[in-house]
Amino acid sequence: MSARRPFSKWALLALLFVTLVAIDQWTKYLAVERLTTLFERTGAETLGERLAGFLEHQHLEPISTDPYYVWRPVWRMNYVENPGAAWGLFRGHSEAFRNGFFTLVSLGAVAFILHYYRKLRAEQRYLQVALALVLSGAVGNFLDRLARGYVIDFIEWYWWNRPDIRWPTFNIADSLIVVGVALLVLHPGSGKAAQKAGADAEGDRRASTGG
């Protein structure tokens, strides 16, 4: 009996990439559904109509009620359209500049990640997963910018019962990038290449994602 072939690193990347990007986009759809007036205003009822509205409509009106609290002392959901980066960076620049800049940064980060991933050995699963997380997050936010010119953010963390002291609103794609970068930096055998990947990806998160 022939030995069982190990799961290809490219198959692992494809599986994680498709799954994580789908989760990111689905949670953004849920944010639009639960936190904006889009479907009420357009009368969309079926899933197909709502998905079409999610992809086609821009600059949506948030619901007028209080934000949805996951855990009231520290965590709530709040719909935000972020045309810039974290802490409002690049908001003052023109849309054409932002789109061009974020496109170049995102494509550069994706190219670097794939170049580094190609060099990994089949048994380096830890680094494969870390890079897959960063890649999925970068592409998830890039799809937002490509379709709308801004990133949909909705997760809002703040200091204990102090919503005025809060972290910039973010999304699942941002979380994937942060976790992936942390794994790269903390990996004891990652070496200088992984350190460089972490620094490059963190720069992409700040410059080309929503927070």
UniProtKB/Swiss-Prot annotation:
TM stretches of this protein: 12-32, 96-116, 127-147, 167-187
GO molecular function: aspartic-type endopeptidase activity
Localization annotation: Cell inner membrane
Highest rank taxon of the organism: Bacteria
Transmembrane keyword on record: yes
Record membrane topology: Multi-pass membrane protein
Pathway(s) annotated for this protein in UniProt: Protein modification; lipoprotein biosynthesis (signal peptide cleavage)
Keywords annotated in UniProt: Aspartyl protease, Cell inner membrane, Cell membrane, Hydrolase, Membrane, Protease, Transmembrane, Transmembrane helix
One example of a Gene Ontology biological process annotation: proteolysis
Active-site residues annotated for this sequence: D153, D174
Enzyme Commission number: 3.4.23.36
InterPro entries per UniProt: Peptidase_A8
N-terminal signal peptide: none
Gene Ontology terms: cellular component: plasma membrane
Catalysed conversion reaction: Release of signal peptides from bacterial membrane prolipoproteins. Hydrolyzes -Xaa-Yaa-Zaa-|-(S,diacylglyceryl)Cys-, in which Xaa is hydrophobic (preferably Leu), and Yaa (Ala or Ser) and Zaa (Gly or Ala) have small, neutral side chains
Function: This protein specifically catalyzes the removal of signal peptides from prolipoproteins.
Homology family: Belongs to the peptidase A8 family.
HAMAP family per the UniProt record, alphabetical: LspA
Protein name: Lipoprotein signal peptidase
Organism, as annotated: Anaeromyxobacter sp. (strain Fw109-5)
